[in-house]
Amino acid sequence: MEYILLLVGFILLIKGADFFVEGSSSLAGILKVPSVIIGLTIVAMGTSAPEASVSINAALAGSNDIAISNVVGSNIFNGLVVVGICAFLHSFMPHGEILKRDMPLNILVTVVLCLMFLDGSLSRIEGAVLLFCMIAYLGFMIYSARKNREEGEPGKILSLPRSLLYIAGGLAAVIFGGDLVVDKACIIATNFGVSQNFIGLTIIAIGTSLPELVTSIVATKKGDSGLALGNAIGSNLFNILFILGMSAVISPLHVLGESVIDTVLLLGSAILLFVFARTGRRMTRSEGAACVLLYVAYTAYLFVR
């Protein structure tokens, strides 16, 4: 029964995030909010809503291992699998701003997280620092985007009542689904005698990263593979700065030694992705395949450690 409810939780997370994004984007169109701002805020937060719901629910429940490992595992999955699969399907040239600004920032943020983890905890003050950095980053992105704004085609606009219904229903599904996933994953971990850290790094991390994976594959099939890298990097920054920051502010997180090791491995994957993107300023199919194989090796390492 736990497995069925876990699956139901994942479905609620993914579909809830989809409805939340669609309703929010439609409301923005009704209110004439620039689409670029929606892309940087609502859509980014919507696709990471499953991770946010799981980690924040885990922090409230005192399941620190899941709160941390969900974010670290999701970020490793985004960097290696999401980008890797898209590059394997179709090699692409990363956008200049991502190479010059966002990828180095992603590495820097991961380094800071490693340093914060060294004392074995993520305090409320450290969480507040991460949240402040997220606000500053969003503020800069919005300022930069509005300064150099290029208006695109308006997206699908629903009626106002339907938009509000999508937002409320989607948010409720994400919150309830996140609570269900955390609860059932903890029970399954206990039954099998495996750690919450392992469950968070694998099953939960992959499940909550499905919106990013699906979005990126669809973009690749439409010939816009370069968006895959932007989606992965943007989601990873949001996961660390907002989700871990908010989780720590709600309840200070105890960090296991294994989590420090996993975060160092996350840093390694971020650096590797940057190197691949810089070489020839193109992510090739062979580099994409290498990323996916590295994730398979990492998963095998989790099984045996």
Feature names for model-found ranges:
Residues 1-305:
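Hydrophobic alpha-helical segments, chiefly the membrane-spanning helices
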